[in-house]
């Protein structure tokens, strides 16, 4: 059916840059929608040739649920029974289920998933417990202890650690930057003198609230 069009396709293929051709070959390993393919053909800055899990990270960021870390697994792990002679090779291929590129993709997916519950911050312990459960139940592997901290330099490309020193939680970059901006604005406003004081005695008003408990230290601080 397509024989008459093959010369046109061949000329089009040969006219592409080597980078675009390599990207197309890489993307053909996965079951992807056309809009995802088009994005990664155009986005030459995204190094999917070395890290195919950037595809699932981007899809999580854009709430494209049809493409997950598991989708990328199918094309990144060598499987001659499916891929024949075209098995993936390093640096593209996933070396193990504990491949840090794969783990980072799982973390990013989880961070976007919990947004529906109103959570923008997840403790490092909670996230490692989540990964540990996945490894144990689905992949039969043992997650190295403190992996989010020991591999921080690689992971923080995609999300931030909070606080920066001695972190206890992780957060998507866009939400971390948003909160940093708001903190900066509020700090600057707090430094300014009030032009028109209201004259209200806020302490007395707070203490008159029915929920105020003078015997409770936390209530006093609030």
Locate predicted features:
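Helicase P-loop NTPase motor core of nucleic-acid translocases
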Residues: 1-222
